[in-house]
């Protein structure tokens, strides 16, 4: 191997990724005086959080009665009873505080007449433990909420003297004596290698939507954290649960926020019928996302799709006043014009369910500490490593995430990780020294990939993986499609060793970067389809046609997947059923969140 010189950096904390969770963690660490570095492969305000449109859920009660227990109930039901009770309680209870903090940091929320934060209805958010009408819980900054939060957190992080390493690509974690002690990075603009030694590494690397052919995710969403964790011999959790957003623009997959339905938009089929009324009589178009995506898919299957190929649906906003569209949904009007050539005030938007969110990820507790579960201790913490945001799996979303629960997940758990790091980091201790053996191992892999001279191009292999995942691990799954998908994916993953990289340079080498990203996507994709094939029930986003019912007796448990090459080993760990606070201390009545049939 060519000898790579590298520069070393010493920090208390290194955060990998600068989206909502990464920046909230970075800001929280820096505020406490911890020496904090944030390493990111794209400029912070280009992170994918910028594309989050609809809003951030918190029971502020600005538009009518609401409380954290109702929010928690909706999150439990949304998760199809796979979320961890302690994490879901923490999310719902801390949400208002986290949103008010954002307001004080300077997020320009939309306002009501009285000057309070404006909140809109969103799918699956209800009152009275699912018995009452829909609630307006989703705090919005027009339809550009993620954009507003990201810019604000980046500015605040700079103010607190966090140091940013921008356009640095994380290659691998450094593991020393069973703890994470740093991360190895490649600086894209000058080709240098950098080793960050730290007392704590926080992975905030986002999801792996790009494992699929059509996704609302940016092309940067390649599951880099999951890939690094898998290579370090740690498991990924609940990977079979992939959310399809009901309304991606037909053809491009560009997201149309659920806020469009929250503001009164509705779906129709080829007969002009508001078909959701048949499937979800109470909440109609605002049922949870997995439900709406399945209903659209059923309508298309039964021949009621629109368009020449009868292969998509319509989202109607024409009946809404143009001034409210301009005020509440300006970005959507623009996206529909650019990506579908549609004027939303005059014609419906063509939409189709599109991969949007990964409920699974790196297993953590509700403080964001990464777990290395064993048979004896399913909650064993892996020292020195945290994961937050879509990269992590706390699991607060279980088998299906509610809309607008992701932005609140980012700030609540980014903040929690900072609080916890402040407690566990010994400020007096030495920063770990460079583990040369681990750095060499990471650079050896980097060099092998850089000089790969096989017969398959990265773009071709990526496309083969994406098409297989889209076809065989989709909205509806069967034993047959999943078994075929597993076989196909094992073969595809096996071809990683036969990749060809044509550009050997180290500076702005997009061919090399995309190849490294593919080596991160592949373990995520493989774990997804293997875990899905094994789960013989339907729960949340995992809709199995051969097992249409949820089976709590056998399957209310988290899957764990260890990936090595094209081989996946599965195990399971129990769901946390205990809340943080007992009912007599003001906690939720556990009878309210006992498993029951999920009807909207």
Curated annotation (Swiss-Prot):
Lineage top rank: taxon: Bacteria
InterPro entries per record: FAD-dep_OxRdtase_2_FAD-bd, FAD/NAD-bd_sf, FRD_SDH_FAD_BS, Fum_R/Succ_DH_flav-like_C_sf, Fum_Rdtase/Succ_DH_flav-like_C, SdhA/FrdA/AprA, Succ_DH/fumarate_Rdtase_cat_sf, Succ_DH_flav_su_fwd
Keyword list, A-Z: Cell inner membrane, Cell membrane, Electron transport, FAD, Flavoprotein, Membrane, Oxidoreductase, Transport, Tricarboxylic acid cycle
Pathway: Carbohydrate metabolism; tricarboxylic acid cycle; fumarate from succinate (bacterial route): step 1/1
GO biological process: anaerobic respiration; electron transport chain; tricarboxylic acid cycle
Subunit-level organization: Part of an enzyme complex containing four subunits: a flavoprotein, an iron-sulfur, cytochrome b-556, and a hydrophobic anchor protein.
Family of this protein: Belongs to the FAD-dependent oxidoreductase 2 family. FRD/SDH subfamily.
Catalytic activity: a quinone + succinate = fumarate + a quinol
Record has DNA damage as a keyword: no
NCBIfam families for this protein: sdhA_forward, sdhA_frdA_Gneg
Bilayer topology term: Peripheral membrane protein
GO molecular function: electron transfer activity; flavin adenine dinucleotide binding; succinate dehydrogenase (quinone) activity
Places the protein is found: Cell inner membrane
Keyword Transcription assigned: no
Binding site for FAD: 17-22, 40-55, 224, 390, 406-407
Cofactor: FAD
Cross-referenced SUPFAM superfamilies: FAD/NAD(P)-binding domain (SSF51905), Succinate dehydrogenase/fumarate reductase flavoprotein C-terminal domain (SSF46977), Succinate dehydrogenase/fumarate reductase flavoprotein, catalytic domain (SSF56425)
PANTHER family reported in the protein's UniProt record: SUCCINATE DEHYDROGENASE 2 FLAVOPROTEIN SUBUNIT (PTHR11632), SUCCINATE DEHYDROGENASE [UBIQUINONE] FLAVOPROTEIN SUBUNIT, MITOCHONDRIAL (PTHR11632:SF51)
Tele-8alpha-FAD histidine sites (modified residues): 48
Annotated active site: 289
Residues that, per the record, bind substrate: 245, 257, 356, 401
EC numbers, comma separated: 1.3.5.1
Protein name according to UniProt: Succinate dehydrogenase flavoprotein subunit
């Amino acid at each position: 191997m060519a000898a790579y010189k590298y520069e070393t950096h010493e920090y208390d904390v290194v955060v990998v990724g600068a989206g909502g969770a990464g920046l909230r963690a970075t800001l929280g660490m820096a505020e406490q005086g911890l020496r904090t570095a944030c390493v990111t492969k794209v400029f912070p305000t280009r992170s994918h959080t910028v594309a989050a449109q609809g809003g951030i859920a918190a029971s502020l009660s600005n538009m009518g009665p609401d409380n954290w227990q109702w929010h928690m109930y909706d999150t439990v039901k949304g998760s199809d009873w796979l979320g961890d009770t302690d994490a879901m309680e923490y999310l719902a209870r801390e949400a208002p505080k986290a949103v008010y903090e954002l307001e004080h940091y300077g997020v320009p929320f939309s306002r009501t007449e009285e000057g309070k934060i404006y909140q809109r209805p969103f799918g699956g958010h209800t009152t009275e433990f699912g018995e009452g009408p829909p609630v307006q819980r989703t705090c919005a900054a027009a339809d550009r909420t993620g954009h507003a939060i990201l810019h604000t957190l980046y500015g605040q992080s700079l103010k607190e003297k966090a140091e940013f390493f921008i356009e640095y690509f994380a290659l691998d974690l450094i593991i020393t004596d069973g703890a994470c002690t740093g991360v190895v990075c490649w600086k894209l603009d000058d080709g240098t290698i950098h080793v960050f030694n730290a007392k704590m590494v926080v992975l905030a690397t986002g999801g792996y939507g790009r494992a699929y052919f059509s996704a609302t995710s940016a092309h940067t969403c390649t599951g880099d954290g999951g890939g690094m964790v898998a290579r370090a011999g740690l498991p990924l959790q609940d990977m079979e649960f992939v959310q399809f957003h009901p309304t991606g623009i037909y053809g491009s997959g560009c997201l149309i926020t659920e806020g469009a339905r929250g503001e009164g938009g509705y779906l129709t089929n080829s007969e002009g019928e508001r078909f959701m009324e048949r499937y979800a009589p109470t909440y109609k178009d605002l049922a949870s996302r997995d439900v709406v995506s399945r209903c659209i898919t059923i309508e298309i299957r039964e021949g009621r799709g629109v368009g020449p190929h009868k292969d998509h649906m319509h989202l109607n906003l024409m009946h809404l006043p143009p001034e409210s569209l301009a005020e509440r949904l300006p970005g959507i009007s623009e996206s529909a014009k650019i990506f579908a050539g549609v004027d939303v005030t005059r014609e419906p938007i063509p939409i189709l369910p599109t991969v949007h969110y990964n409920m699974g990820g790196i297993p953590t507790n509700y403080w964001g500490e990464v777990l290395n579960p064993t048979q004896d201790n399913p909650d064993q913490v892996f020292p020195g490593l945290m994961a937050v945001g879509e990269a992590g799996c706390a699991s607060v979303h279980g088998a299906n995430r509610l809309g607008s629960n992701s932005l609140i997940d980012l700030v609540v758990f980014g903040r929690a990780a900072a609080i916890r790091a402040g407690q566990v980091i010994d400020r007096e201790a030495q920063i770990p020294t460079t583990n040369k053996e681990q750095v060499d191992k990471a650079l050896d892999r980097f060099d092998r990939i850089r000089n790969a001279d096989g017969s398959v191009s990265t773009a071709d292999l990526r496309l083969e993986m994406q098409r297989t995942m889209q076809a065989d691990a989709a909205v509806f799954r069967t034993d047959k499609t999943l078994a075929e998908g597993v076989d196909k994916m094992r073969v595809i993953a096996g071809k990683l060793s036969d990749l060809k990289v044509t550009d050997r340079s180290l500076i702005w080498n997009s061919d090399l970067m995309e190849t490294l990203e593919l080596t991160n996507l592949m373990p995520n994709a493989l774990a997804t389809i293997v875990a899905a094939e094994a789960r013989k029930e339907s729960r949340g986003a995992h809709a199995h046609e051969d097992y249409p019912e949820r089976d709590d007796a056998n399957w209310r448990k988290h899957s764990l997947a260890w990936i090595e090459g094209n081989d996946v080993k599965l195990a399971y760990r129990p769901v946390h059923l205990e809340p943080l606070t007992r009912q007599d201390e003001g906690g939720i009545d556990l009878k309210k969140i006992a498993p029951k049939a999920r009807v909207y």
